Structures are given as C-alpha cells and as structure tokens.
Amino acid sequence: MMLKNTMLKAVLLAITISWIPASIAAPITTTALGHNSTTEYINVPFMPYANPNAPKGGTLSLEARGTFNAANKWMTTGVAMVGTDYLYDTLMTGSLNEAFTMYPQLANKVTYDPDDTSWIIYHVNPAARFWDGSPVTSSDVKATYDAILNKGPMYIRSYLGDIKDIEIIDKQRVKFVFKSDDNKEILLTVGQFPIFAKSSIDTDFEKITLTPLMGSGPYKLGRVDAGRAVSYVRDHNYWGRDLMVNRGRYNFDMIKFVYYQSDEIAFEGFKSGQYRFRLENKASNWATGYNFPAVKAGLIHKETISSENPVPMQGLVMNMRRPLFQDIRIRQALTAAYDFEWMNKTLFHGQYERLQSFFHGSELAATGTPSAAEMQVLSPLLAKLEPIQRQAVLTEWRLPTSDGSGFNRKALLEARQLLLDAGFYYDDMKLYQPNGKLAQIEVLMTGETMGRVLLPYIRNLKRLGFDATLRQVDGPQYYERMRRFDYDMVVDVFAQSLSPGAEQAAFWGSAAADEAGNANTIGIKNIVIDEVTSALANAESRDEIVLYTKVLDRLLRAGHYLVPLYGKSATNVAYWNQYRHTEKLPTNAVAIDYWWTDKEAEARVNQYLKQ
C-alpha cells in the first residue's frame, strides 16, 4: 500500500536482487529493490502500464470531501488539502504491478549489505532540483526525516521507529542507520516519504498555512479557494520528467480537487461537469443513477477496474478503551446485530461482498481451518488467548447471516443471549451492564454518506435494548475526536497492500493503542497479535509473509474487534469521456497518474457543457 492519507504501503524486504549472485556478502549498489518481490522493470524504458507518447495537456478534476486549512499533511495540527503528494518526490517509487518493488526517483541508486540490514545509503540524483532550481541534497533528506520523526503524526513516528540515526556522508549520499537488522522492510520504508527543502522545514514545517513546503515534484500549487477547491499545475521544468517511472506519467496540465460536504451534492456536481472523474462508491448510483442527459448523449463512461490488492476492511470499530467493549461476548453480539444481507439487497442492489477477512480477495486471506504451517505458528500462542478467541482461531470463519427479510430475528436472539451470558440484564425494556449502568452506545460519524447504512444498525441495537445514538459532527470536530480516540463506535477503513509488514503494528499493536493520533483506532492490546505482527515485519520470504498474514487475519477476526461491513474486489469509476488510459492497467491500482486527455473529446465535452 502506498503512503496515504491515507494509509501506508507495507514494505517488504528480505531484499532479492535477481541479477546479484546470492553468494556475494559485501555491500552492493543497485537501482532497484524488491523485498520478496520481483524486479521485472530494471532495464525497461517505461512502465508497461504507461503510454510514453501520451499527449500532455487538459485538466483532471476530482472530488474531495469536507474542508481544509493547511498544505502540510505531515504535521499534527490542521486539516491538509487533498493532493499534496503531487508537490513532492520520494527517494524511490513503487511498481504498480509487483507486490513491493522500488525504482529510482529522487535517489538514482542505493547501497546496502544483504547480510547486515541495519543500514542503507540512498544516493540523491545530482540532477534533482526543487521548484526554485536549487539542488536536492542529502541535507534536505535528513532535515525531512528529522522533522517527521520529531513533529509528525504519531502513527508515522511509530512506523519509522526503527530509525536510529541519519548521517550525511556527502552532498549526494545519506545513510540511514537502524536500531537492529531485524526489521528488513525499513530499508525500503525510508524511500517512500516526500522530501522537502531544508530551508522550508526550518521556518514553516509546523505552520498552519496554505503555502506548501518547497518541493521537487511534478506539480506546483495552483489556485486555492480556501476550503472549497485546490488545483495543482504541472511544472514544465520538472527535473524528473524523463525518469523511467515518469515516462508517460503526469500528463495533465492541471489537477483539480473540488470539495463537497456530502456525496449527494458531489454526485450532482459530477452530473453538471464541476468535476469530471469520479470514484463511484455508492451502489445505488452505480445501479440506477447514471441515466442523466450526458450519459444518454454518450459523454459519460462507466468502467469497473479489477484489482489484485486486498479489499480494504471497512468496519464499525469498537473502542476497546471503553469498559463496555472489554468482554468479547459483547463484541460478538454487536457483530450479530448487523444485517448485511438485508442491506446488500435493499440499499446496495446486491453489488457488495461481506468482508470475511482483513485481507479479503487476496492470497493473504485466511480460509478454512488453519494449515499445518499456520498451526506451527499458532500452537505455542494459543494458551495466551481467551477461550472464545482461541476457539474461533481454530475453526472455519463465518460471519452471521440472515435471510434478508429485514427482521434478523435469529441473529438478534443469539446476540441477546450473548449479552445475558455476559451479565447484562433487562429492566423495563432497557438493557443494563453488570455494574448497573445503562448500556449506551454512541456511533460517531461525519458527513451524510454513512447515515443510511448506520441508521438500520442503530435500530437493531435499540431492539437489543441499547440506548444507541448516531452522532454526526463536522469535519474538524470529527478529526479531533478520532485523534483523541473519543468515541464508542466509528466506521474506519484499514487498507492493505499485497506486502503487509511493520505498519501492522501501528494498526493493531499494543504500543500504538495509547498514542493519540495513532492508527490503532480499536485500541487492541493483545500480546499474541503483537508477537505475530513482529514476526510478519521480520519475514524473510514471500511464503513467510503469506503465512504470518494469514495467522494475523485469524487472530483479528476471532477477536471480534469490529463489525465488518462490505466491500468489493474492483473499483467502479465514471468519467466524462475525455480521459484515456492504456489498454492494460496495472494489477494493483487505477493508476490515474498515467491517464491522459483526448483533446478532441475534451472539446466535445466542453461544448456540451456550454449548452
């Protein structure tokens, strides 16, 4: 998973360089790194999903949600504008066709020792330049990481926690030294972050401002309509335009994000051409909403793009920091109260899948009962698990199902019995905890999109006797409450790549549970999960990565830490018929950076919208 707003790419590294003999024990210098992954594109002129002859020009316009007041997403305050990654280069960039392989960007090569992975040297390309023409140097790299490690979000600091020191060797070479050689993937992790100019960092890193830190990326900040829209304009003097990974990439002269407060308003904006490329996440829209005049005129294209990545786990998180959720039987009951079959039929037109795995739809998902290899990992750990979780780990996993009628009677009766078994009791039609307190649950949300999904769930909780409420707050309040873990239940999304690793500790690790702003929104503290995530981070082969991920999957499911909602193994996109892409897209992404504008088609669209 590439670094996100989102979300971090799991970086793999029992580094395999296929053209280097395994017997060489001395440090080597190379232009590509793959951790338990292929390095197929070491000698190609451009990526197979790129069109090196793609025309430059046009505008890519997309939607964003909420608002913004800052340009730096790497500090702990403010709400950053969408799209700032276009302003910066990373030391290396990943292939979208391989599990995890990195190719040169700001760095044109690396030096490391396969037998001692406690350090790596990145060689900054002497041709690399910031927007103002000044060279990118090792001092800028060190200053960037020093700022992120000392002032960045806690989950990022945790992710980079194995960095011991950063040494400037000379103007072009920077050496990362790690606390041990156990974490193989950290060598590649440090190649994934944007690099800022030291001069900007020294004065502006923690300022809440709409002026970005100085970068070297393919775009500069264009027009900003505070809180409403932001655009990025292509830098025609971009130093890296001829790099292998960039040929046929960054083809749009402008990339614009238009902000909306709700999906309904955003969809209307798409219909009227306010923005022209849309990721369609609403099933009812996809099934029946594309019948407006522009569709009938042949100017809107709908496309379903497949992906080999795991389907992101979207679920209703139960905050384990709250006493209410400590008993696993309560969490089981809350899971049973969610009626997926009715929702999928009634709200989603049957388009979604129930997520049976935290790595759903990939080779990483645990299926059936544990294999012999999985049992070898699990056997010494089982005694440390509570009985219900232990039993669920050892059996085939299946979430509760209903007949889709909307009554969900069988599951609710089972949920009621689980509550009674846990010591809850009823008095005057109300549900009370064993300590005599009323059983109350507030589900936190922002925006309106999830309301129609959550309200039926709230009704089922009330049928069980809970004093359940849905609390909608504005964006800034939501983000602050999320940062402080101030919620009972909330929808969260855990995106995964095909190469999970050290970032799993940030999602599920005990150390992350009490760090404000970290990614462990559930608050899991489980020593067995800690041991398995550690083993996964130190995996030395692809087989080990798959093995430990499947074991982790079983543990997370068996803990009933969230209510899995729904997902889909493909991405639905709709766009005004001015955009083009290569015939074969990459296996792991939509790869919008490699699309381009058909100028004649764009003219037809513009003419239509003027009518």
Map each language-model feature to its residues.
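Extracellular/periplasmic solute-recognition and catalytic clefts
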Residues: 165-168, 222-233, 258-322, 329-333, ...
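Gly/Pro-rich hinge or "lid" segments in bacterial periplasmic/extracellular proteins
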Residues: 67, 78, 87-98, 190-249, ...
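N-terminal lobe/hinge region of extracytoplasmic solute-binding protein
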Residues: 26-115, 123, 146, 214
